[in-house]
Regions:
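C-terminal beta-strand-loop-alpha-helix "lid" module of Rossmann-like NAD(P)-dependent dehydrogenases
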Residues: 1-302
Length: 302
């Protein structure tokens, strides 16, 4: 009967775990829906802003070509040889139970750091999310300039993105860094996500959509007091929206990974409960049969 007691205890413990994982799955699903809703609602603004920036950049570049000059600004992508000091912002989570989400980000960040070091670049790292910091601190503690809790735990607010942007812009305009990249998980669906390292500063003019030339058409932008001032005003706005979009993608990816992980855990718990219950019933049936056999044998002996 000791075996039956152990099985009852295991079944009860797994049922308790199943309830927890099921509840966590529902919470993650709710947060995922909120993040997706923000993504959908912010898309028109983001697209409109980026289209406007692209049109202005194309027009200014065209005007510079007509005047046989070069469009120069610290906000525009500098030559490769001048990109010496890199800031890597790693967006991970504070909590686990989300499958390979954090480990994939840690591996991508490690690979990028090693790539930059091999190229002779100076690297600084900002870790947002304790899991990301834990993945990097063993080998890169000397280059981690700040480690803080994740900014996407409960939900992303624009002021949080703006605060991070202000910090990065301060380093960039203060000539402390030449390039800023963000390592994060870009959301595709609840079951699919891509870990990427994306350059956010300086603005890479080569990545402008080729369709921007058509969008600009015959439009003529006259900048006052000059083109550079216009760039230095509008690019930071686009940068903040870019970071906000990255944070929302990061949150949606985390919650999608957690929902998927908890769904798998709930299914596994359910399967284990079924197997243990079957085993329990068989042992119980064997025990009852043995007792009946002993009773019948005793009665016949009398």
């Amino acid at each position: 009967m000791a075996g039956l007691k152990e099985l009852r205890s295991r079944i009860a413990a797994i049922k308790s775990t199943e309830k927890i994982t099921s509840a966590m799955k529902m919470v993650a699903a709710s947060r995922l829906r909120r993040a997706q809703d923000v993504l959908v609602k912010s898309e028109p603004y983001r697209k409109g802003l980026f289209d406007t920036v692209s049109r202005i950049m194309v027009t200014l570049r065209r005007q510079a070509a007509e005047n046989d000059t070069r469009l120069q600004s610290s906000w525009i992508c500098a030559p490769k040889e001048k990109q010496q000091r890199y800031l890597l912002v790693v967006l991970a989570s504070d909590k686990g139970l989300c499958g390979s989400y954090n480990s994939a980000i840690g591996k991508a960040a490690t690979a990028r750091i090693e790539e930059l070091k091999a190229a002779g670049r100076d690297v600084q790292v900002i870790c947002l999310g304790h899991r990301g910091y834990n993945a990097l601190k063993r080998h890169y503690a000397d280059i981690i300039v700040r480690a803080d809790e994740s900014v996407v735990n409960q939900g992303v607010e624009y002021h949080e993105a703006a605060s991070l942007c202000d910090e990065i812009i301060s380093l960039f305009t203060g000539d402390k860094i030449d390039v800023c990249e963000v390592v994060y998980s870009r959301f595709k669906s609840a079951l699919s996500r891509d870990v990427v390292s994306e350059q956010v500063l300086p603005f890479d003019i080569s990545k402008i959509d080729t369709g921007a030339d058509d969008m600009a058409g015959d439009a003529y932008f006259e900048a006052e007091p000059d083109n550079i001032k216009l760039l230095e005003t509008i690019i930071p706005l686009a940068f903040k929206e870019f970071i906000f979009d990255i944070m929302i993608n990061s949150q949606a990816s985390e919650q999608g990974a957690r929902m998927s992980s908890m769904d798998n855990a709930t299914r596994n718990a359910s399967d284990m409960i079924s197997k243990l219950t079957l085993r329990y019933n068989r042992l119980r049936q064997t025990a009852i049969t043995t007792e009946l056999t002993e009773i019948i044998a005793g009665a016949e002996a009398i």
